[in-house]
C-alpha cells in the first residue's frame, strides 16, 4: 500500500528498559542495526501493525510491553535512489512512519528473534538512548533524531526513577 506521494505507511518501534536504554537490533545476516519497523497492512491501524510487527520481529506480545508514547505526526524518509525499485508499480520512494515508544515490562528472555520463517534480526543489545541516532544508516538518521527527541522526556523520566543495573550484557544472539 503506497500513498499518492510514493510513501509506504509503516510503524517504527523503540523498546526501552527500566534504565532508559533502548533495544538495538542487528539486521539478519548484515552488519547494520536498527529499531524494529514494518509496513501497515490494508485495514490495519498503526497500533495493530505495531503489535503484529513487535511479535514478528522480536517475539514480544502486548503482555510484555507497555505503550509509553507515540509520535504526534507521521515522519518520512526517502530511500536512496539505488534502493528504489523502479520496475515495481506503484513506485515506493520511501516510508512514512508512525513511531511507538514501548517499555519492556517482561524479561529480556522473552525476546525471541526467531518467531518468523524469515527473521528480520539475528541479534540485539541494550544501548544508551542517543546511540541509535549516530549509528543508523544515513537516510534514516533525521527520522531517528526526531523520534528520539520527541520521546526523550518520557524515557529520561523512566530512567531517573529506575534502580541502576549492576552490569549489562553486551550482545545477545538469536534464540531459537
Curated annotation (Swiss-Prot):
Disulfide bonds: none annotated. GO terms for molecular function: mRNA 5'-diphosphatase activity. The keyword Disulfide bond does not apply. Residues 6-149 form the Nudix hydrolase domain. InterPro entries: Nudix_hydrolase, NUDIX_hydrolase-like_dom_sf, NUDIX_hydrolase_CS, NUDIX_hydrolase_dom, RppH. The keyword Cytoplasm does not apply. Its EC number is 3.6.1.-. Belongs to the Nudix hydrolase family. RppH subfamily. This is RNA pyrophosphohydrolase. It comes from Klebsiella pneumoniae (strain 342).
Amino acid at each position: 500500500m503506497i500513498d499518492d506521494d510514493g510513501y509506504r505507511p509503516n510503524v517504527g518501534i523503540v523498546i526501552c528498559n527500566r534504565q532508559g536504554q533502548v533495544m538495538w537490533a542487528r539486521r539478519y545476516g548484515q552488519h547494520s542495526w536498527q529499531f524494529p519497523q514494518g509496513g501497515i497492512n490494508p485495514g490495519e491501524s498503526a497500533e495493530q501493525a505495531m503489535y503484529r510487527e513487535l511479535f514478528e520481529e522480536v517475539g514480544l506480545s502486548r503482555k510484555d510491553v507497555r505503550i509509553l508514547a507515540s509520535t504526534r505526526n507521521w515522519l518520512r524518509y526517502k530511500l536512496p535512489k539505488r534502493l528504489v525499485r523502479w520496475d515495481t508499480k506503484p513506485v515506493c520512494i520511501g516510508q512514512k512512519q508512525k513511531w511507538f515508544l514501548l517499555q519492556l515490562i517482561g524479561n529480556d528472555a522473552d525476546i525471541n528473534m526467531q518467531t518468523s520463517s524469515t527473521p528480520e534480526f539475528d541479534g540485539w543489545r541494550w544501548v544508551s538512548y542517543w546511540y541509535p541516532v549516530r549509528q543508523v544508516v544515513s537516510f534514516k538518521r533525521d527520522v531517528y533524531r526526531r523520534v528520539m527527541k520527541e520521546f526523550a522526556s518520557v524515557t529520561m523520566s523512566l530512567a531517573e526513577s529506575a534502580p541502576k543495573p549492576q552490569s549489562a550484557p553486551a550482545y545477545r544472539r538469536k534464540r531459537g
